[in-house]
Amino acid sequence: MEALAPTAQRLLAAAQRLLTSGGFEALKLSAIARAAGESKASIGYHFGNKAGLVTALVDSFAHDANRGLIEDTGELPKGEERIHALIDGETRIAADAESYQSFFEVLPHALRDGDLRERVAALYDGYRETVLRCLDASDPAAKEQLRPFAMLMIAVVDGLAIQHVLDPDVADVAAATDLWERLVRPYLTEAGSLDQG
């Protein structure tokens, strides 16, 4: 996330290292600041509070991949190529076991902590918007029609990621998303996303 100040980037990198090595319980503000070589007050300055830092951390797991999805699909005409690029990109996200392992460390806490839950829910809204942008759903009617697909796309990615993290030798993410692409074509055709217009 290049838009962050260098101090904020160091804090996020330190938080990621601590999360990877010690789980969510290792995300103590003093430990993060110490690992980043920064003051504890810098966390408040850059992120507001721990929930803000954890939200930025969760966003960092998929930020570059989502940006890449928007760029890759935006270069393609509306239609099959664009749909394939979207699902191919989502396949790569689902197969990123390291990022999802970190996300799964945070998720139970987001479900219990109201502030964190609200922030992670806002991230999910952004992920759905990413799918809608990739489908070129720019007007309100198209967004309304394609929002259920966006919700299911995110659910498929999360569900496949869980299976891939638990059993990477058996969970064939690519085969599952190939099937998903075939299953959604009739719906996307009806919605106008596969028209070459």
What is each model feature region?
Residues 47, 92, 105-112:
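Short helix-capping/turn signature of helix-turn-helix
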Residues 66, 70-71, 96-104, 114-139, ...:
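Amphipathic alpha-helical packing segments from all-alpha helical-bundle domains
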